[in-house]
Amino acid sequence: MKQKRGKQDVKMVESAPPQLLPKKGRLEISELAPQQRTIRTAEEIEMAYNEAVRKHPFYDNADHTIDFHDATVFRDARGVVGGVLLPGALPAFAATMAADVLRPAAVRTSLRSNMFGGFAPLSGIAGYFDYRGSPVELKCRKTSFTYENVHSWPNVFPMIDYVSAIYKAVFPERWAAQDAAVPDIVRIHGSPFSTLTVNQQFRTASHTDAGDFDMGYGLLAVLEGKFEGLSLALDDFGVCFRMQPRDVLIFNTHFFHSNTEPELNHPKDDWSRLTCVCYYRAALGEPACVAEYERRLARAKEIGASPPPAVDAILQKDNGNNFNKPAPTFTYSLTPFGGAASICSLHCCTAKLLRLHELLLENPTLEVILFGESLRTDDGLPRREKEQLISVHLPVVVKMSPSGGFSELGGALKAAEEKQYFFEEKYLADELGPDLMSMWTQSRAHWLRLVKEDWERLCRRDPERTKFTWNNSSAMNAAFFDLCEVAKQMMIGLLNKETPSSAENHSFWILFAAHLNYACTTENGMPRDAVGMHKLNVKLKDFHFGGTRYLKDMPPEEQERRLERKKRIEEARRRGNAARETHTDNWLLNDTFDYQQEDRKVEFEENGWMTPEAYVKHLGLKPCGDVTAAASPTEPIHVLVVLPRPAAAAPKDVKRDVPLATSEESIRLLMNPAAQRVLTGKARNVTLPSPLSFGGVKITVLFDGDDIDCIHPDFVVLQHLLAAIEEDEAAKARVKYWAHVARYCVFVVETDVRDRRHFLLREEVRVAYEDVAEDCFRSLHAAAYSTKCNRLRTTPSLIALSNSKNIGLRFKFRGSPLNTIALIVVGERLD
């Protein structure tokens, strides 16, 4: 980009925690709000949900066949890349710096409620946006969040630079096309991205990202969080990408995608997740926006704007054809071999895996030989009824606390304690005028001093005391109400509006209380909960409603003094607002040519950080090449299937020990047609089949423990072997052993005793299932393999046996009567 002025070099530093920013809704912090902030009837909630999911349904993990865990390149049936998963690809410091800036960008917005079951999610945009179809009069410019956070915005740049370098390394041609199309004045820090979408605790329903550049990809980065599940799913393809903080996913945002359910032990458990999607908003390169840039530039030159424009002229680039429609999907039947072919660490054997994938599709009977059952069973475990599952949004309606107090339910108190630093002076100074900041500092210090004096007096009477006694007629109480008056004006000043919303009130006052409670501990040396959040909450409500010894009960001269004090506080707040309104209040009216004024150079080496170019080399990233063809039918491929050794032959007249199917759950598990075939059929490991050959493909079947001196397989399939091994260490040793035997990888095929919709089951259904599941699956396993079933495990425990770092993917056998899964364990990465 041609510049009239040089870029300003600045040393990048770790950004401070997010400030309470002066934008509507910025104080609506999800962790601090009650579980439901508005009152809606059950009928209204149901109606909104049904309307939303009619167009944008939610899909659960059980609705998808493959969960990718490791670095992956997933392609459609025509070989076009749909998604590239890169675990841990984003440097930790860059993720943290970006999170600290972008966290407040995610605000409650009804604009995306159709993707959240009719509820307003926490979501926002940063960078540049066209505002096409929006009532905002001035288009094609910085988002309000970027405008209001221009000073901290450069701390996002390291993340942007790394993500851009990753994109360029993996898809150089797509990166170049996107880079060539994006107008220079709306690109974020020289990247091919114009816009960021920031989501917080947002499980999206199925959707496409209309408006993204058709010839490029979007890049999803998980910046921070404590969560399990919430995989990014490509819904039409039946695949999920499991992600954790610092993971990056490059994917076609024009495919329908969504998030699977959060995996919580209890529906009300706390979880957090902050993500950022980087993309080019194609409308910013269309003629209408280019005309807007030209108009603003001409005006800036006419008035001699200072600082001067970053460019001399606006160039209309070739923006390609952007249809804002879902991309065509070319799906194919999924198999464990086809899924494994997508795993990057198995690229050396991709051709062989694709040959096995083709062979399975050509000969479906091989599924039973290799895995013990078909990949899909239509009459097996039936799908759960809607009534057995919890709602996406819990049907809990909590009445909002009156303004001035806060709800003490759920995880709000814990979240407030973690964020109490919002009220520290260094984070408020830039948002409030000096007069109001001085009042806050002095009032806070005065109240803390009086609290300390009262506490020391109480402790002299009782040295073992742990709780503070609040005297409603004390000077400390009066100082607290005075401090609340200052805080109230701070809230109005921060939000820049006289009437904050209920959620903003709630978030502000719970943070305020958490900060004071923390200060009593750290500055006054009091026990952690000596004052306590509950007591502060009660006093805040006293303040709001004119409680004991407040204004209406005070002598006339004291009332007059306090009213005068309140007036001075309001004036201080207004002076502070006036001082900053040129930067914050005027976003709607901002008609300047301020594009790229926020750009700064990132001093990577000065800060001791790897440059993006060096970093992608460090990661070993290479361009996604052409589609790998399946190996020729004559190429030698050896698959070894290992079965559990059967128990000693039992008399034919001895009946199998099958539990009675008396409960609804046991009937579901044992009485479906596929389960009945298992219970009445022949065991799969009574006799070993002879080796099979299909051209160059050889399949050998043997028992665990047999001599394998002359066998050197490419792939090993362990067919329900671990269920016969009770001790985890022994089971882990068998997986490790067979992983060393396999030239490439091992397919661990086992029963998952956990219900596929475990995290969605109503509590009573989950309890009923868990009461009978183990006994039922033991019977099914004994019938299928004629061996004692010593230990059934869940997916997490099976992953633990194989070392989670070695897991490439999980494949779920659809409708399997044994609830079978296959884990791909990459042998070459084992110790």
Curated annotation (Swiss-Prot):
Gene3D superfamilies linked: JBP1, DNA-binding domain (1.20.120.1440)
GO molecular function, one term: DNA binding
Cofactor annotation comment: Binds 1 Fe(2+) ion per subunit.
Subcellular location(s) per record: Nucleus
UniProt superkingdom: Eukaryota
Cofactor: Fe(2+)
Pfam families recorded: DB_JBP1 (PF18526), Tet_JBP (PF12851)
Chemical reaction(s) catalysed: thymine + 2-oxoglutarate + O2 = 5-hydroxymethyluracil + succinate + CO2
Enzyme Commission number: 1.14.11.6
Residues the entry annotates as binding Fe cation: 207, 209, 257
InterPro entries assigned: 2OGFeDO_JBP1/TET_oxygenase_dom, DB_JBP1, DB_JBP1_sf
Region of interest (Thymine dioxygenase), residue spans: 80-282
UniProt-annotated stretches for the region DNA-binding JBP1 domain: 409-578
GO terms of biological process kind: base J metabolic process
Record comment regarding domains: The DNA-binding JBP1 domain (DB-JBP1) is necessary and sufficient for binding to J-DNA.
Function according to Swiss-Prot or TrEMBL: Dioxygenase that catalyzes the first step of DNA base J (beta-d-glucosyl-HOMedU) biosynthesis by converting thymine to 5-hydroxymethyluracil (HOMedU). DNA base J is a hypermodified thymidine residue found in the genome of kinetoplastid parasites, which is localized primarily to repetitive DNA, namely the telomeres, and is implicated in the regulation of antigenic variation. Also specifically binds to base J-containing DNA (J-DNA).
Subunit structure as annotated in this protein's UniProt entry: Monomer. Binds to DNA as a monomer.
Family listed: Belongs to the TET family. JBP1 subfamily.
Annotated protein name in UniProt: Thymine dioxygenase JBP1-B
Species for this entry: Trypanosoma cruzi (strain CL Brener)
Name of the gene encoding the protein in the UniProt record: JBP1B
